[in-house]
Amino acid sequence: PLRDTHPHLTMKNQTFHLQGFVDGLRDLTTTERHHNAYGDPFTTLSPVVPTVSTTLSPPSTTGDPALSPEMSPSSLLGLLAGLQVVYFLWTKIPTIAQNLDWWWTSLSFPGGIPECTGQNSQFQTCKHLPTSCPPTCNGFRWMYLRRFIIYLLVLLLCLIFLLVLLDWKGLLPVCPLQPTTETTVNCRQCTLSVQDTYTPPYCCCLKPTAGNCTCWPIPSSWALGNYLWEWALARFSWLNLLVPLLQWLGGISLIAWFLLIWMIWFWGPALLSILPPFIPIFVLFFLIWVYI
């Protein structure tokens, strides 16, 4: 029979081959429809004439992805540096105050600080130094007053350093009080174009006029510092070599400064016996960095 001699002509195989033909035809039809919708890559497209739509579609919101509420690495580094600074202040400020108290007391006794007898009408204390009086000693209130003044001076120095740093970075308004009359001041930064990027210290520009700004004067503090720097440069020309170093130090972040102070405070005395042989090499590298 035919199904024994020609098994490929059976109904089952015919159905299988017919199904394959239908699938191939469907794929071909889908490909042609895709080319009709998006264009055949092998055909030349005619230029499209731009038209203006009468209806405005809302702008799409594109840009950087939203920041996750989790803490970023820089924030974590800042938190760790802040904790180190707090620990540093908590452990070292009493020692600093005691050393400054010792120096202050030694000014009154050039021959050496005598011992405090600690005699009191109510309490009898042992002999001790005037910089470490117990609460039962009469000199405790004076020691406490000296320490309080020292703490105020240290706090004032830190505040001045912070204000100078913020002013140098341009984060403080250089003219906090608005003048009564608006005058055009020829600031060094304000004579540039409005589109240019200003370098600190910033001028307080009220409004741009003809490429310049109507400014307020730069504060006297920065002007005095600039005058002193120009005066020093006029008499000591070698200070020009320090300008790249100062610019580099000014670009360091506040966190890096705290970490540097932390390392110098703890490892500085131990490194004094190691660094002297390498100082000429450091000077040579600095000269190469400046001149090359």
UniProtKB/Swiss-Prot annotation:
Pfam families: vMSA. Glycans are attached at N212. It comes from the Viruses. InterPro entries: HBV_HBSAG (IPR000349). It is found in: Virion membrane. GO terms for cellular component: membrane; viral envelope; virion membrane. Residues 1-70 are annotated as: Pre-S. Isoform M is N-glycosylated by host at the pre-S2 region. Myristoylated. Residues 1-75, 169-240, 291-292 are virion surface. Residues 11-70 are annotated as: Pre-S2. The keyword Membrane applies. Its main location: virion. The chain crosses the membrane at residues 76-96, 148-168, 241-261, 268-290. Residues 1-10 are annotated as: Pre-S1. Residues 1-147, 97-147, 262-267 are intravirion. The large envelope protein exists in two topological conformations, one which is termed 'external' or Le-HBsAg and the other 'internal' or Li-HBsAg. In its external conformation the protein attaches the virus to cell receptors and thereby initiating infection. This interaction determines the species specificity and liver tropism. The large envelope protein probably also assumes fusion between virion and host membranes. In its internal conformation the protein plays a role in virion morphogenesis and mediates the contact with the nucleocapsid like a matrix protein. The middle envelope protein plays an important role in the budding of the virion. It is involved in the induction of budding in a nucleocapsid independent way. In this process the majority of envelope proteins bud to form subviral lipoprotein particles of 22 nm of diameter that do not contain a nucleocapsid. The large envelope protein is synthesized with the pre-S region at the cytosolic side of the endoplasmic reticulum and, hence will be within the virion after budding. Therefore the pre-S region is not N-glycosylated. Later a post-translational translocation of N-terminal pre-S and TM1 domains occur in about 50% of proteins at the virion surface. These molecules change their topology by an unknown mechanism, resulting in exposure of pre-S region at virion surface. This is Large envelope protein. It comes from Woodchuck hepatitis B virus (isolate w64/pWS23) (WHV). The lineage of its organism: Viruses, Riboviria, Pararnavirae, Artverviricota, Revtraviricetes.
